[in-house]
């Protein structure tokens, strides 16, 4: 039996759907009154751990899970050693740079030198501004980063944007897209190397489904 780390939240339903099509049914995790964090598949070939999206690469990297599904945004930010297996295509959103709508900034180079930029994704934000050779101070927030510009603490934010509705409702506007993030299938490198074909069969099944 192998272990899969499934992400709570927006990616969960599609993650369970793709594993179900590959022969591993963890539908119990979607039940409204469910409080369990571990599930066995209907065929007893695998079990799933229900974890926060940001923790998926941690469980996979440390070997507590053999496979996992995680957003590319989290995977890129974590920098943990995992096997990057497949782009699953769902859960799409942009990692974007946004500012107050009534500001004078229409592109990244308009931002003043050494201004503050709020983000949950500090490594991503730092890498982005370093590549542009723009000196900024990155302010790490774990909650609603939109409050950074609203309160005047930051000139801009780097955050995930799906529909743009949250930005609009808070008087913010995108001025650049950094990358496009989708759900990714990842694996523990040692688990894959020592696999007795159970993991490989599941990966190949998902690859075939994903190609349709």
Curated annotation (Swiss-Prot):
Q: Where is it mostly found? A: cytoplasm
Is Ribosomal protein among the key words of this record? no
Recorded catalytic reaction(s): these are: 1-(5-phospho-beta-D-ribosyl)-ATP + diphosphate = 5-phospho-alpha-D-ribose 1-diphosphate + ATP
| Annotated Gene Ontology cellular component terms | cytoplasm
Molecular function terms from GO: ATP binding; ATP phosphoribosyltransferase activity
Task: Cite the InterPro entries for this sequence.
Answer: ATP_PRibTrfase_cat (IPR013820), ATP_PRibTrfase_CS (IPR018198), ATP_PRibTrfase_HisG (IPR001348), ATP_PRibTrfase_HisG_short (IPR024893)
Q: Name one GO biological process term.
A: L-histidine biosynthetic process
Where found, per UniProt?
Answer: Cytoplasm
Per the UniProt record, which EC number(s) apply here?
A: 2.4.2.17
Q: Which keywords fit this entry according to its UniProt record?
A: Amino-acid biosynthesis, ATP-binding, Cytoplasm, Glycosyltransferase, Histidine biosynthesis, Nucleotide-binding, Transferase
| One Pfam family this sequence matches | HisG
* Enzyme class of the recorded protein, top EC level: transferase
Q: In which pathway does it act?
A: Amino-acid biosynthesis; L-histidine biosynthesis; L-histidine from 5-phospho-alpha-D-ribose 1-diphosphate: step 1/9
- State the similarity comment: Belongs to the ATP phosphoribosyltransferase family. Short subfamily.
- Reproduce the free-text note on domains from the UniProt record: Lacks the C-terminal regulatory region which is replaced by HisZ.
Q: Note the NCBIfam families from the entry.
A: hisG (TIGR00070)
Q: How does it assemble?
A: Heteromultimer composed of HisG and HisZ subunits.
The record's HAMAP family line, in alphabetical order, gives: HisG_Short
Q: What function does the entry list?
A: Catalyzes the condensation of ATP and 5-phosphoribose 1-diphosphate to form N'-(5'-phosphoribosyl)-ATP (PR-ATP). Has a crucial role in the pathway because the rate of histidine biosynthesis seems to be controlled primarily by regulation of HisG enzymatic activity.
Identification of the protein by name: ATP phosphoribosyltransferase
């Amino acid at each position: 039996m192998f272990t899969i780390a499934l992400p709570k939240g927006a990616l969960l339903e599609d993650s369970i759907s793709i594993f179900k099509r590959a022969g591993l049914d963890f539908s119990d995790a979607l039940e409204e009154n469910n409080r369990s964090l571990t599930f066995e598949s209907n065929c007893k070939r695998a079990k799933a751990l229900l974890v926060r999206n940001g923790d998926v690469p941690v469980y996979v990297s440390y070997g507590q899970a053999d496979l996992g599904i995680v957003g590319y945004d989290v995977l890129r930010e974590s920098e943990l050693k995992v096997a990057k297996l497949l782009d699953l295509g769902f859960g799409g959103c942009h990692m974007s740079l946004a500012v107050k709508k009534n500001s004078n900034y229409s592109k990244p180079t308009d931002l003043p030198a050494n201004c503050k930029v709020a983000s949950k994704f500090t490594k991503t934000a730092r890498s982005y501004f370093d590549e542009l050779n723009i000196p900024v101070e990155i302010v790490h927030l774990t909650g609603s980063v939109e409050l950074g510009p609203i309160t005047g603490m930051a000139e801009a934010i780097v955050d995930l944007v799906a529909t743009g509705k949250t930005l609009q409702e808070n008087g913010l506007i995108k001025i650049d897209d950094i990358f496009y993030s989708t759900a990714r299938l990842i694996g523990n490198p040692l688990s894959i190397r020592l696999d007795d074909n159970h993991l490989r069969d599941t990966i190949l099944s998902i690859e075939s489904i994903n190609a349709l």
